[in-house]
Amino acid sequence: MIESVLKASKIDKVLIATADGTDDSLSGDILDLQDCDSVTGIAILGDVTTTAVVTLKAYTGDEPALGDGAYETVTATVTADATSADNKLLVLDVIKPGKRYCRFDLVRATANAVVDGVIGLRYIFRTIPTTQGTDVVDSDINVN
């Protein structure tokens, strides 16, 4: 059997592009992890000003609106110099969080940072193949 990311995971855009800003927290959409064991958040950065601190955090809980939620201990963080964070990615992998729901939050501090979006990648599904949601407008698999 050929393994495929498209058939073994679900890909969602959980946070849309956001203009430059600082000293704020951007909350992504909540992902349901009922049928999978892990989720990865991928923050896509745009132009990031020197000294900006950008942190990707995972907020997890068992209630659909995350009323019981808490932040996971590990984060993905960058403190930018002149070009170190421009058009780069922050990636945070949450393996077996033990909670049903997860939201990725992006915190911007100190200086401006443009966010081109955050992707949520749910994987290790108990039942495959999976079907992609509406955020994926088209996909295909090439096997040679």
Task: Locate each region found by the language model.
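Surface-exposed, low-hydrophobicity beta-strand/loop segments enriched in small/polar/acidic residues
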Residues: 1-144
